[in-house]
Amino acid sequence: MFGVKEHNTTNNFSCNTITIERIEMKKLNLKILACTGILLSSSVFADGHSPVEFSANVGYFSDYIYRGGSQTADGAAIQGGFDMGHESGFYLGTWASNVDFGNSANIEIDFYGGIGGELPNGISWDIGALYYWYPGVKAADDAGGDFDFYDIYAGVGYTFGGDLAPSIGFGIAYTPDYFGEVGDATYYTVDFGVSLPGDVGLAFQFGYQDNDEENRAGPSYSHASVGISKAIGIFTLDLSYYFDIDDTKEFWVRGNDEPDALVFSVSSSF
């Protein structure tokens, strides 16, 4: 785990509702995206359907980027998950991806749950917890640290009116014992997005990984990304560029040792 968790996401979104797509954690999918959490609005259930809804998602990614760092040594990833949401705003879900940390870790399975909603002024909010599980990892391969860990996260977001429906979101995720049992870490994100004609979306994200002074994982760092997505039928195509803002993030990079990455993905939710 070279970076800090937040899953691959697409760019056509609204901070007021997680439109069933995570992977776009899109479409009720774990999209810790512009509103960094999984902003699940009760408006999803406003059409009179069952108070409980289920969804699933699957996608191919040319790389699995997590908080600015590759989780697959610059290799491709197949990812997918299942989600359940209640009209009250409560949700549960699970998500999985292949990983490559150069040891016995080859799969990541996440479990998450929380509650979110929308205030009368249109501001969306979300709080929850996310657990990262790396089954089959042997302690001898970890250099003495347990890979499994959890985040407690919160996010707020707002989507403005107009044809472009610009969105802004702020998120924070805290873990008392980060990946590898290295110490406290807090992750901050700021996201912006706009919707263009033709089911095209643009997204921009700034992230900051704040490692505690006693955190043995290395120095804190910042990163950013910009991407464009296009919905075609039941599929979403996405092209995103991830880049570092300071040199310290190179500490986290594996693979070809390049801190920047251009990632293509195709995903679907149902």
Question: What does each of the following model-derived ranges do?
Answer:
Residues 54, 88-94, 121-127, 161-170, ...:
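Repeated loop/turn-to-beta-strand initiation elements of outer-membrane beta-barrel proteins
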Residues 226, 230-235, 241, 256-270:
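Outer-membrane beta-barrel "beta-signal"
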Residues 145-215, 219, 241-244:
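Detector for outer-membrane/organellar transmembrane beta-barrel domains
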Residues 1-53:
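Cleavable N-terminal export/targeting peptides
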Residues 62, 84-86, 115-117, 131, ...:
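Residue-level signature of outer-membrane beta-barrel architecture
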Residues 52, 74-78, 105-109, 146-152, ...:
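Residues that define the transmembrane beta-barrel architecture of outer-membrane proteins
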